[in-house]
């Protein structure tokens, strides 16, 4: 099965080797037929502590690293 890749914004870098990334998705509301925005936060592994708050990044699914971390940061987006 291919690994999922998501794009999001770093919202916290206070943990060692971990960043919290907010990923936003948009969908049409089934009744109102209006575009709705929902976001979810993922903890991602950042081996070199190189990403800072506000950076746009891509995260990739991986094997569990800890209780909450199942994603790793692949690259920064411009």
From Swiss-Prot:
GO molecular function terms noted in the UniProt entry: rRNA binding; structural constituent of ribosome
Keyword tags: Ribonucleoprotein, Ribosomal protein, RNA-binding, rRNA-binding
Entry-linked InterPro entries: NA-bd_OB-fold (IPR012340), Ribosomal_uS17 (IPR000266), Ribosomal_uS17_bact/chlr (IPR019984)
GO cellular component: cytosolic small ribosomal subunit
SUPFAM superfamilies cross-referenced by the UniProt entry: Nucleic acid-binding proteins
GO BP annotation list: translation
Biological role stated in the UniProt entry: One of the primary rRNA binding proteins, it binds specifically to the 5'-end of 16S ribosomal RNA.
Assembly and interaction partners: Part of the 30S ribosomal subunit.
Stored PANTHER family: 40S RIBOSOMAL PROTEIN S11 FAMILY MEMBER, SMALL RIBOSOMAL SUBUNIT PROTEIN US17M
Similarity comment text for this entry: Belongs to the universal ribosomal protein uS17 family.
Protein name: Small ribosomal subunit protein uS17
Organism: Rhizobium meliloti (strain 1021) (Ensifer meliloti)
């Amino acid at each position: 099965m291919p690994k999922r890749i998501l794009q999001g914004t770093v919202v916290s870098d206070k943990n060692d080797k971990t960043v919290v990334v907010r990923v936003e998705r948009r969908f049409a509301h089934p009744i109102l037929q209006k575009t709705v925005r929902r976001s979810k936060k993922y903890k991602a592994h950042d081996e070199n502590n190189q990403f800072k708050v506000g950076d746009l990044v891509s995260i990739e699914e991986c094997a569990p690293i800890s209780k909450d971390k199942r994603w790793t940061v692949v690259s920064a987006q411009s």
